A protein has these predicted regions:
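Conserved beta-strand scaffold positions in the cores of enzyme catalytic domains, especially
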Residues: 27, 103-105, 161-163, 264-266, ...
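Conserved beta-loop-beta/alpha segment of the NTase-like Rossmann-fold superfamily
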Residues: 67-68, 92-184, 236
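Charged, glycine/proline-rich intrinsically disordered loops and linkers
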Residues: 76-98, 198-216
Length: 295
């Protein structure tokens, strides 16, 4: 089992402006049907821990790190009298402390893309295989680790990169990283042939369709990646070659480099994900979690 996971959360939150100016994306609140308030950070961390992950590295900006740290402190002694009178507050506090014990904050000093964010966590990784979980995705059902465990199990079987995928229609391929695979003998497991970041519908139809899927459906990243230790040497090479004046470098750069060295796989999970990275997506995620009793 992969012991560590990296959760990138260092973005400016421009798609959640102006709230993102004062509230980091990972701390956007959600109200559950039982009346409990929680955050994206908590929902992600709880699912990773339930999946057997032991250490979680959260990549944040230097400006937001104190905000995250203060949140996990849960108010400390200042709120102790109130917690003593309200059991639900004490339970929430204890939940935060459990997460805090397994969590390390890692600073990304410059916002140079997802690949750079993961590279900033190389000290935390210490050369180990790694799960990467995008910081604006919530797995469903809440707290169910099945999808993450399935990807981790596929990684354990092949010792090669495994990427969680879900299906998107042609009309939405330009919003995602799209991956073309070929079926294997294992259910829901495909061997990766190529990937392209946010292609046009025309390009996707000509080059990225996976055999066995309906003509109007494509595989897109679902926000969960399992990488072998070779990821770190690939990122080191990219970091040495990258010219900052050329803008961000994505994780796709490392995925392509690894694909030249070893096979990689796609796993289509049976579960769904909620994205809360934009105002529209956040509204949908908030309402879904608040109203559904089966999450």
């Amino acid at each position: 089992m992969i012991r560590k996971a990296i959760v990138p959360m260092a973005g400016l939150g421009t798609r959640l402006y102006p709230i993102g100016v004062v509230l980091p994306k990972g701390l956007m609140p959600f109200a559950l049907p039982n009346g409990i308030l929680t955050t994206g950070l908590q929902l992600i961390a709880e699912t990773l821990l339930a999946a057997g992950v032991e250490q979680i590295g959260v990549v944040v900006s230097p400006e937001n790190r104190p905000v995250y740290e203060a949140f996990l402190e849960g108010g400390g002694a200042r709120y102790a009298p109130a917690r003593a009178k309200r059991p639900e507050m004490q339970r929430a506090y204890e939940s935060l402390q459990t997460i805090r014990c397994h969590l390390t904050f890692i600073e990304q000093p410059e916002l140079l893309g997802l690949g750079h964010a993961v590279w900033c966590a190389r000290g935390f990784a210490d050369g180990e295989p790694m799960l990467i979980f995008l910081g604006d995705h919530i797995p469903l059902p809440l707290g169910d680790p099945t999808a993450i465990q399935q990807i981790a199990q596929a990684f354990a079987a092949h010792q090669s990169p495994v990427y969680g995928v879900h299906r998107v229609p042609t009309s939405k391929v330009s919003l995602y990283g799209i991956l073309q695979g070929e079926p294997t003998d294992a259910p829901r497991l495909y061997r990766l042939l190529q990937l392209h970041e946010k292609p046009t519908p025309e390009y996707a139809q000509q080059h990225l369709h996976t055999a066995g899927l309906p003509p109007d459906e494509f595989f897109a990243h679902s926000g969960v990646y399992a990488f072998p230790p070779a990821l770190w040497s690939a990122l080191e090479q990219i970091a040495a070659e990258h010219d900052p004046t050329h803008g961000e470098w994505t994780l796709t750069h490392a995925q392509r480099r690894l694909l030249q060295q070893m096979p990689a796989y796609l796993y289509e999970t049976e579960h769904h994900w909620l994205d809360f990275g934009t105002a529209h997506e956040y509204r949908h995620a908030f309402c879904y979690l608040a109203e559904r009793h089966d999450v």
